[in-house]
Each structure stands twice: as C-alpha cells, then as structure tokens.
Amino acid sequence: MALGRALGDAIRASEFGGRVLVAASGGLSHWLPSNDPRDPSVDATKKASLVHGRRDARAFAAAREPRVRAMGGNSEARVNPDWDGWFLEQLVAADAEPVAALGHDGLEEEAGSGGHEIRCWLVGHAAVGLPLVWTSYEAVPEWITGMGIGTTFSVSVYAPTS
C-alpha cells in the first residue's frame, strides 16, 4: 500500500498529474500447484527447471500446456468467487486496509497461491486514491482464476437491443 501511495504522490506532483492512466492487473483468487522446489509434491523435472532454469522454453511450454488444461475444473485448481467479490467490494468502498491486514498467510488462505497477484490491484488502488465505481466479475474455473475488472470512472455497458 505504501508503494501505491508513493506512486500516486509522485504522479500528482508531476507536471502530468491529471493526465496519467494508472493500470494495475493481476489474477484474483486461484490455487495453483506448488512452485516451491522444497515441496515434496513437486516432481524432479519441474524442480530442476525451478532451480536451474529452462534451456528449452518451447519444449517446457509444450509439456506444460496439457497439464494446465487438465487443471481446468480440477477441485485442487479452484477459485473463490465469494472472496473475489469481497475484495472488489473493498475497492468500491475505497477501503483496502482489511485486505492488506490479511498479510501473506491470510491472503494465501483466502485467495490461494495465485491470489498474491492482487497486490498489483492494491498498488494501483492506493496510487489513484479513488474508489472503484464500476466492476465486473466472472469466476472462470477453466482458466483457473477469477476474472475481474474495475474502474474509477463510470462505464456505459453495451446491451444489444434485439
């Protein structure tokens, strides 16, 4: 949060203060398989790539894709739509402190190992210093994440007439 506030202060103090777009992105809740080389559930090939890097990124990506696709809908690769909704509500209320108060372990418990990506949202929110006024959210288990968007300005949503 301090990083976001400092970024916002620097932007507002600059000659471009009112003409800067702050964009923050990251996944919402999602539980991914471990990437910790100390974790016994991590297989030897993955452990070696984590410790020593990947010599052949294309081969690694080709081998990884079927595993990722298999995770879609897998109960261990879940999302938490209730938590995602609560998180977005905090940003609408311009009160991210309850989220920050969760700390590392609390955040991981509620939003999963991939939930730490919401820190980007927190930095952007603190930099702008305004509540979100429009949000949209969809849990997408096939992509192993909750997908959300929010803005600090109103958005007209196109609705087909027929």
What residue spans do the PLM features occupy?
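Flexible, D/E/H-enriched segments
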Residues: 1-6, 13, 35-162
